[in-house]
Amino acid sequence: MTAQLKDKLIQQALERRLRHAAQSDSAPLSLVSGFGATDKIPEQHYRFHLHPGYQQIRIMNDGAARLGIGNPFFKLHEGTAANTTEIGGKSYINYASYNYLGLSGHPAVIAAAKAAIDQYGTSVSASRLVSGERPVHRQLEQALARVYGVDDAITFVSGHATNVTTIGYLFGPKDLVLHDEFVHNSALQGIQLSGARRLSFPHNDWQALDNILTEQRRHFDRVLIVLEGIYSMDGDFPDLPRFVEIKRRHFAFLMVDEAHSFGVMGKNGLGIREHFGLSGNDVDIWMGTLSKALAGCGGYIAGESALVEHLKFLAPGFLYSVGMPPPV
């Protein structure tokens, strides 16, 4: 089965490239655009230390050094992420972590992680499709599905990769993705991977979204709307019922990233769905991470069976990745 799936994915990729090439009006690609076969290749094209990104970092660091400003990044924190942290033996109030419920370092969580290592080891050593499936994976996914009141859920080894592979796989060049202007980088990377048309709307402005859909919906096959439960850099949240009504009226999919709202919003901490009293089926794609309130690592997608089954068998970021470590 695995070989067949790989062959199918490769064939689909080749077909997409052939279609793209057939539709392109560009001239044939030369070996190195702008240079003849005997011309010398500029050094910045094959040296990492001349890469524009690295040069930008050097300029920033040199400027900070001249101003006597130390590098605030990659500080070595000692111990568990909590309301305080230690750096270089000195205690500080910690505003930089997202262990929202204090579960990272909780005795019960530590004990469960140790028990999982004793029973299953530190790695499942395979993708879940092949031989990496363990009872703890399905227990976690079924628990997430119950919390959201939906059919099923799927977990990924990376929160960032969850958005990238889900959006990147489900949507394509004939589709449109509309997103709040403040959505996370992972959603933007997923949109870029998909090849879909991307349009942003002003932060939390459901009326602007409605206007865009009124003008643009008929020009695309599938349309995805991407929001966040809580916007981590601003601390605010969308009027989700308004967005649900809009997506229904325009026959679009709605995806909500609950990385920072799950465990924080709602009477019982069950997220923005509980806060507004919505049904799980009001949102097509519930996304979240396991590294914030849930004190682990990775991400998840929750929704109807057709969505989850689809991702399990065909989403590259799940199919070709190792299953989550049992202690996580």
Residue ranges and their predicted role:
Residues T166-N185:
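Conserved PLP-anchoring active-site segment centered on the Schiff-base-forming lysine
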